[in-house]
Design a protein with these regions (language model features):
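Flexible hinge/capping segments at coil-to-helix
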Residues: 48-49, 132-149
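Periplasmic-binding protein-like
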Residues: 34-35, 123-130, 204-245, 262-266
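A ligand-binding cleft/hinge motif common to bilobed small-molecule-binding domains
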Residues: 88, 104-113, 161-164, 190-223
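Extracytoplasmic small-molecule ligand-binding "clamshell" domains
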Residues: 24-104, 113
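Short helix-initiation/N-cap motifs at beta->coil->alpha
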Residues: 63-65, 80-91, 137, 172-186
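Ligand-binding clefts/hinges and TM-proximal coupling segments of bilobed small-molecule sensing domains
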Residues: 157-171, 243-266
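Hydrophobic/proline-rich hinge and linker segments of small-molecule sensing/allosteric domains
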Residues: 29-41, 117-139, 229-231
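Ligand-binding cleft/hinge of the Venus flytrap
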Residues: 43-55, 68-76, 155-176, 181, ...
């Protein structure tokens, strides 16, 4: 019995050592979908400053990736992207698989119950993407979508904004924006709510799409419109991360986003 106890104790120490080593190595493991251009996407080479995706021969790039590189540099680490589904990001962070989430994530009150957030590194504007030749192509206000079948991404604040489109039909939330684009093109939906950079990306990729912006747009909480870095609550590097973000001015953020929109895959 004593030998069994000692063996188990040794195994626990060994496991603890591996966990510490994983956290203490040269890499900063960043979680993202790598499927939400221009914030993050997957590509086959390291062109335009892309970062390796762990466990694959592919690379990630986009606005989030470039922010991740600057944060990693400030922490004396090398960035390494861990491709993770949206709903799996927070569990992966809290379990220690990720060091940080840099994935276009808003610091909502609900998420703050589980993880900590840095200062904002981008502020988003919600828009609606429709078919250029569709019934809602000339929409000007939130009241111009009566009868429209509208959706957005599951688990994202954008989906809750559908109720602000007067008379619109709230369709089932979808897993990612690639699904939404396909559904829009095929006529399954009449439109979806997105953030301006993603909608611009969709327009560039498909000439059949049209982005609808509003002079008086959605009523959005500041915590939803801003995007921040997700970290574990006990991570003592938060101050360093905030210092790195502070060095990126609002002007630089806009310039970087415009550059990523140009570089994104079509």
């Amino acid at each position: 019995m004593k030998k069994l106890f000692l063996s188990l104790f040794a195994l626990l120490l060994l496991s603890f050592g591996f966990a510490n080593r994983a956290q203490a190595d040269e890499y900063l493991r960043i979680g993202m979908e790598a499927a939400y251009a221009p914030f993050n996407w997957t590509q086959d080479d390291d062109k335009n400053g892309a970062v390796k995706i762990e466990g694959t021969n592919q690379y990630a790039n986009g606005y989030d990736v470039q922010i991740a590189k600057q944060v990693a540099k400030a922490l004396g680490k090398k960035p390494l992207v861990v491709k993770t589904s949206w709903n799996g990001l927070i569990p992966a962070l809290t379990s220690g698989k990720l060091d940080m989430i840099i994935a276009g994530m808003s610091p909502t009150a609900e998420r703050k119950k589980e993880i900590a957030f840095s200062n904002s590194y981008y502020t988003s504007e919600p828009v609606v993407l429709v078919n250029k030749d569709g019934a809602y192509a000339n929409a000007k206000t939130l009241k111009d979508f009566k009868g429209a079948k509208i959706t957005s991404q599951q688990g994202v604040y954008l989906y809750n904004l559908i109720s602000q489109l007067t008379g619109a039909k709230q369709e089932t939330a979808m897993g990612d924006f690639a699904q939404m684009r396909q559904a829009l093109e095929s006529g399954v939906i009449d439109g979806y709510i997105s953030e301006r950079p993603e909608a611009l990306t969709a327009e560039s990729a498909n000439s059949k799409f049209k982005m609808i912006q509003f002079k008086k747009g959605f009523d959005v909480n500041e915590e939803d419109a801003t995007i921040a870095i997700g970290m574990r609550k006990n991570d003592k590097r938060l101050e360093q991360v905030n210092a790195a973000i502070t060095k990126i001015s609002a002007k630089d953020q806009v310039a970087l986003m415009d550059k990523m929109i140009q570089n994104q895959p079509v």
